[in-house]
């Protein structure tokens, strides 16, 4: 089994000559390699809808973890309900932070997402995923190379130093148009915020719509140097 400790580059290759541009091949490998020791960390963005559809074909009882920061858009929570109806056998786990928002405010002050967004992300996203991955050998992410400069070198299979795990990224070669084409073709549910200028959807406090021609990540932590929550540190 390929693990963080036994990491080797290019130990497996994948065919990209199908509708999924390698994603189906990658996921078949991941569930064969790790069985029930792999989890998909899903933010329920539009890429997530594509991955959930393909994962459901490969492993209908797959584990899916959603990092519920308690400050997501209401539209995101409603989408999760629809996904549960569409894919009832998937094991969707809503992972909560240890601190409630009130407890966080007492310890670190009100609106931590404004005063120290890195700490807020650590408390509400990074630490919960870290705890989820303690019992897993690998995790799946919907990163695409096209999304931003920080993601353009992502590979199908990555040695993840942040969580000392294997990170599987099946959608690296997909374009934004291909993601949407797949969603429409398969009549998949998606977050309606995508229709009003939100290409990337995170917490409500830290996500704004993006103007025409903007980077898909421009609406995240707008006005701050920060462009990543920290889950995908390389």
From Swiss-Prot:
The keyword Manganese does not apply. It is an enzyme of class 1 (oxidoreductase). Its main location: cytoplasm. It comes from the Bacteria. The active site is at 229 (nucleophile). It catalyses: [thioredoxin]-disulfide + sulfite + AMP + 2 H(+) = adenosine 5'-phosphosulfate + [thioredoxin]-dithiol. This is Adenosine 5'-phosphosulfate reductase. It comes from Bacillus cereus (strain ATCC 14579 / DSM 31 / CCUG 7414 / JCM 2152 / NBRC 15305 / NCIMB 9373 / NCTC 2599 / NRRL B-3711).
């Amino acid at each position: 089994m390929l693990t963080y400790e036994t990491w080797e580059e290019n130990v497996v290759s994948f065919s990209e000559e199908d509708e999924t541009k390698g994603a189906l091949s990658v996921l078949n490998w991941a569930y064969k390699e790790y069985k029930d020791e792999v989890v998909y960390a899903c933010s329920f963005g539009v890429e997530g809808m594509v991955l959930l559809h393909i994962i459901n074909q490969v492993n209908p009882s797959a584990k899916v973890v959603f990092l519920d920061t308690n400050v997501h858009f209401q539209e995101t929570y409603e989408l999760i309900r629809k996904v549960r109806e569409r894919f009832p056998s998937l094991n969707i786990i809503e992972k909560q932070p240890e601190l409630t928002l009130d407890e966080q405010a007492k310890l670190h002050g009100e609106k931590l997402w404004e005063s120290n967004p890195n700490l807020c992300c650590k408390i509400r996203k990074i630490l919960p995923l870290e705890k989820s991955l303690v019992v897993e050998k690998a995790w799946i992410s919907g990163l695409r190379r096209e999304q931003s400069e920080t993601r353009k070198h992502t590979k199908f299979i990555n040695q993840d130093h942040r969580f000392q795990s294997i990170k599987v990224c099946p959608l690296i070669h997909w374009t934004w148009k291909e993601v949407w084409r797949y969603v429409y073709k398969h009549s998949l549910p998606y977050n309606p915020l995508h229709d009003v200028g939100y290409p990337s959807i995170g917490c409500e406090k830290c996500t704004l719509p993006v103007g025409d021609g903007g980077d898909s990540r421009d609406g995240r932590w707008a006005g701050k140097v920060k462009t990543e929550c920290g889950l995908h540190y390389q």
